[in-house]
Amino acid sequence: MAAPDLAHGGHVSRDSVCLHEEQTQAAGMVAGWLINCYQDAVTFDDVAVDFTQEEWTLLDPSQRDLYRDVMLENYENLASVEWRLKTKGPALRQDRSWFRASNETQTARSHNGGQLCDRTQCGEAFSEHSGLSTHVRTQNTGDSCVSNHYERDFFIPCQKTLFKIGEQFSVLGQCGKAFSSTPNVVSQQACTRDRSLDYSSCGEVFLNQSYLQARAGSHNGEETWKWKPCGKALTHSMGCATPVEMHAVRNPHVCRECGKAFRYTAYLTGRVQVHPGEKPCELEECGKASPVSSSLTQHVRIHAAEKPCECKECGKAFTGLSGLSKHVQTDPGQKPYECKDCGKACGGFYLLNEHGKTHTREKPFACVVCGKYFRNSSCLNNHVRIHTGIKPYTCSYCGKAFTVRCGLTRHVRTHTGEKPYTCKDCGKAFCTSSGLTEHVRTHTGEKPYECKDCGKSFTVSSSLTEHARIHTGEKPYECKQCGKAFTGRSGLTKHMRTHTGEKPYECKDCGKAYNRVYLLNEHVKTHTEEKPFICTVCRKSFRNSSCLNKHIQIHTGIKPYECKDCGKTFTVSSSLTEHIRTHTGEKPYECKVCGKAFTTSSHLIVHIRTHTGEKPYICKECGKAFASSSHLIEHRRTHTGEKPYICNECGKAFRASSHLHKHGRIHTGQKPYKCKECGKAYNRFYLLKEHLKTYTEEQVFVCKDCGKSFKNSSCLNHHTQIHTDEKPF
């Protein structure tokens, strides 16, 4: 099928898209890479994609044909670039007939009367590799052209094996002699001489005497020719032309807009179209435009729902061969690369290398802005966008932008509800693979990330990173509103909701909203009255594990949190924090209605209900409502008669701990409430308030019978008995 004509601003339909675009893009990338790396010796093994025998069987005939075409074109690009790097200027300007530039080529053609490459299947011969490549593509050979030789390596699928990925040799059609590099295929000297030229210093084998001499010079430190502009030293005169050609004509096509140089005019054309915003390649279905046609290939298949590459194991289909290759490597049953340190199996060699860096902690890529190090260049590129503020990936649903594509992918699933990753143990689904991985560890108990300071282990690396900041004291996430700092980004996000008033977690039963998910979970249990956590000592049940842990400390008597000011101990850290505020006088929670401040957020919440009149806690026995759950609990004991708080001095029992605390002052003689005017002290706060009225002469309690006024209600009640002749005592 012919490639779609996109070079002149034409529209593209689904029927006009073919796999040739993918082939062209891959070949162009290889050619560009080879040119940039011209200084080093490049072999076909550096750019070839290798398949194992098992992976090859998963490909259907059309996928094998595509693979064959791409590899042949890569091979052609490799041969062309390598030869041009080693010939002089005039040869570079010749078209694709670079074989004719060498006398050795003419001698090589003497094998078959001027025909270098032989097509054994049909008998047709060609003088150039490009001619053979084109001919191979025009033949509808199907599976018959696939070599069945699967020894140590995989042969490129072609009726006449041209090269082998592992040892990488070319076959000269007439004599069948194998060579280690493409230019040497055309060397008559190589055809008549065995591979016996080796250099004893390093043991390398060469096909050409000049290559051997050049290698020997590199060992001896010879630098006979030196190129002045770049200072590159060369050991033989033939190579001296190479830097000249590379500096002068390696990238002859220069963009006038930005000055960037390109090897080929096609690359320059694509670059020029980017600057003025020209996008001649436009799609009929959605109007998506791109400066180059190859950019639309993958996108077109989205509209066409075309996924020609299908995995034979699980049936999953992909738009391109590269997607299938990655899938085959990441398939759970196909993880041939095992880590020698921990035994973990990876689906690809690249993944194994990345995993290996977690053991060595190797981070060779540094940010020039902040100096932070990363394991690979892609992570560094993503990080740099934090400094530049670039967010190229935008959500089509809500317009939110992201710095990385995976961030957008995860976000889109919040709109679609897609959760493609399912736990095989419990069936729970997740929108990200990392979420599933973390969840699976709850079943296995695996905690691979261990703190070197205290030995505590974690299921995810981010938790370890946050924990490590406890030891270092680092708090990099700071609130711009109040300056409060946090060890993790999630802590800052939750804190910001106290400023914005955002409450994203809403109860489906009553509509009440919360700013923390755990608060919503706690609230939901008030509807279900679920208390799944039971104390093994007294069988008391609780809504969550934290409440149970606090309760257990009543039985054990453990109070690990001690106040440095007064020595008082507490069972939980939050109680110590609240207690410290009694010494400092800090009251950070202020009522916006009346301005009254409180030491704890729970006290503020209860206070606000005095303004709103809200009483969400209702007694099922009598229907009485309360503003706080603790008041409801105390009230229920009036029905049950329960008095769990007993005085150790006199044995008196009370329904609430606060009542016991106040009663205890009778035995200790403690009087914490002191008058500032006269210094008189009281053990109850209401008694101090009554005393203060003697200074203000406030008399608000008036007798209805005689009009006499009193300072407090108890005095009025005592006076009322005079009018009723009541004598209760």
Swiss-Prot record:
Q: Pfam families from the entry?
A: KRAB, zf-C2H2
Q: Where is the KRAB domain?
A: 42-110
Tell me the GO molecular function terms: DNA-binding transcription factor activity, RNA polymerase II-specific; RNA polymerase II transcription regulatory region sequence-specific DNA binding; zinc ion binding
Q: Where are the zinc fingers (C2H2-type)?
A: 115-140, 253-275, 279-303, 309-331, 337-359, 365-387, 393-415, 421-443, 449-471, 477-499, 505-527, 533-555, 561-583, 589-611, 617-639, 645-667, 673-695, 701-723
In terms of InterPro entries, this protein maps to: KRAB (IPR001909), KRAB_dom_sf (IPR036051), Krueppel_C2H2_ZnFinger (IPR050826), Znf_C2H2_sf (IPR036236), Znf_C2H2_type (IPR013087)
> Among its keywords, does the record have Transmembrane?
no
State what protein this is by name: Zinc finger protein 778
Taxonomic placement: Eukaryota, Metazoa, Chordata, Craniata, Vertebrata
